[in-house]
């Protein structure tokens, strides 16, 4: 009997599958016999329970399982035979009684949508360009110097000097203080500490704290009012004004290492000294520039593709993607050490928009790759792996690491595929080159 497929919408379909209950007779008998071997009933040895008792307790369950599996198998055979582009999991609903001679199931399912590609030549994207010069290298080296900063007490002579004649706390200094805060003259929880350390100007403390400590010398104290922000994490004091008193215990000035061959060696530059260090810093900055520019262009191209293409997104695919995002969120919580993260009640609805966008873009890319033959080639994958491996100390080991794991290879394949899509899109769209500084590039999301 020919199977009819009913069109319920742009991607929604329905079909009815029928088969004779007798077709399952042998499977049913074997399944019940298997259940009977492990069934435990008082008064009977294992495997000796009468068939009638097995039938009475498990007959309906076995019928349903076998009938559902049979209908599911028939449906997937139908999809393969008819070339149905199934999207997501089908929903099977029994249409007949378990004991009926002819078993029938209604199957509701979705198909992959038609993707209508827009006019890519009408789109405009920005491709940023950034040059790394001596100033950018100097700033990067300053960051590396700050990572090796150490502090000396102001006014005390040492190998690196005494920090100057002014012994008062200045921006950039590390101060150690005792403080106590009171609300209506009464100390409150969390409002008192001894030997509390912070660096002036880093913005780690509330502005009033920094302003009070600035200019004080060791042994000096200062009182000041502090109004906690309304959204302060401590709810007992949020929005309230407390009176704080601080006493400075020590003021320490920052000493950063001199940029010399010894400093270069401390960064792992064994030969070539400062010149080689600057060369490596530039290479790292160039890689970072390339990564950020590629990421920004990719993000804009994907947004333009999303806007230019028309399609109806199958709900089943969105639901599956939401579930994946929920599991990913739980995994993230587990890695952070959050208790009971595995069963955290995370509602899938909060990921609805993100999941829809992901599925939509995935369908667009799939269609574009198929139509324009943009799939990643073996040579492209190899070239990408070798390029990434070249930045490591042992490139051959990194190459082996990638090829030893199919999941890692798949990640590289997807990376190359996305690059192919970007190249195809930008070959058709209007690309506007825009030169910006490294600092400006760093601020772009």
UniProtKB/Swiss-Prot annotation:
Residues 172-257 form the PPIase FKBP-type domain. The keyword Oxidoreductase does not apply. Pfam families: FKBP_C, Trigger_C, Trigger_N. Gene3D superfamilies: 3.10.50.40, Trigger factor ribosome-binding domain, Trigger factor, C-terminal domain. One of its GO terms (biological process) is protein transport. It catalyses: [protein]-peptidylproline (omega=180) = [protein]-peptidylproline (omega=0). Keywords: Cell cycle, Cell division, Chaperone, Cytoplasm, Isomerase, Rotamase. One of its GO terms (molecular function) is ribosome binding. Its EC number is 5.2.1.8. It is found in: Cytoplasm. It comes from the Bacteria. It is an enzyme of class 5 (isomerase). Consists of 3 domains; the N-terminus binds the ribosome, the middle domain has PPIase activity, while the C-terminus has intrinsic chaperone activity on its own. Involved in protein export. Acts as a chaperone by maintaining the newly synthesized protein in an open conformation. Functions as a peptidyl-prolyl cis-trans isomerase. This is Trigger factor. It comes from Polynucleobacter asymbioticus (strain DSM 18221 / CIP 109841 / QLW-P1DMWA-1). The lineage of its organism: Bacteria, Pseudomonadati, Pseudomonadota, Betaproteobacteria, Burkholderiales.
